[in-house]
Amino acid sequence: HIESLKAPNCSDNINNLTSVPLIREKNTALNGVELVTSVPKANIDFYSRCQAYVSFFLKLKVPKADERHLDDGKHFTKSNINVCYAAPRSKRKARDWYETQLTVGADVYHKEGYHEKNKPFFVITDDGYWFKAHTTSDNNKQFSAVGDELIMGRWLKGRLAAAGIVNPVNNTLEDTDRLGMITQEMLEEYGCD
């Protein structure tokens, strides 16, 4: 019985396999969100082969793990992807853990082809989601989804949660150890900074 596991029809060295797709964890944080649509894999493959008119890298500004409690304004503990740890908008309710405010650097928003302020465009993610986004604020430096400030966070943080790197937090005011705060180490573990 044990010897049958070595049979070629049952297993092989992964280096010998060429047509087996690698499957990563599925981010389900955007499932059922009204302003988000699932995109079939064939469409994702098509769009990935198309040349983009303009592309840019959004640097996520996050603290190191040992800087999670340094609220001096220099360590990004309450801004960008971690804005959920900033002061609540209401005394009765903490900010949602998925709330993010992606601030784009001047090196990006000065690029030719960077989107104009408040002119919506569509984002198609590599993991199969489609939603409308826009830029706002001075110099178009805020990059966010249209109509729901949690969509971008559900996409970014949802991927980290699906990979088992962080657990979503129900109440950021009660997360006194800030274990739900996204850190440089988490991004490095995921494979992107």
What are these model-predicted stretches?
Residues 1-68:
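Signature of lipid phosphatidyltransferase scaffolds
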Residues 44-191:
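Polyanion-binding interface signature
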